Amino acid sequence: MEEERIYTIPLRDVTNKSPTTKRAPRAIRAIREFLKKHMKSDIIKLDNSINEKVWERSLNKIPAKVRVKVVKEGDVVKATLVE
């Protein structure tokens, strides 16, 4: 059974609690952890568009939040960016 949801993932905590040189990698990790918690799955596949959005303005100026469309097929969760 396929399950589809749209989430707005806040990244403000990552910005406030991380040094400027580690913000983008920690933001990607935070997105994965958010999806693990809310979709209840360990296998998370992030689309390249999410990575490009986070890294778009360099590694220290990440967006405050990201809107993501998530599809769960069995145990696999696939996430893409909502435009």
From Swiss-Prot:
GO cellular component, one term: cytosolic large ribosomal subunit
InterPro entries per the UniProt record, alphabetical: Ribosomal_eL31, Ribosomal_eL31_CS, Ribosomal_eL31_dom_sf
SMART domains registered for this protein in UniProt: Ribosomal_L31e
Domain of life: Archaea
Keywords assigned: Ribonucleoprotein, Ribosomal protein
GO annotation (BP), single: cytoplasmic translation
Keyword Ribosomal protein on entry: yes
GO molecular function: structural constituent of ribosome
Family, per entry: Belongs to the eukaryotic ribosomal protein eL31 family.
Protein name in UniProt: Large ribosomal subunit protein eL31
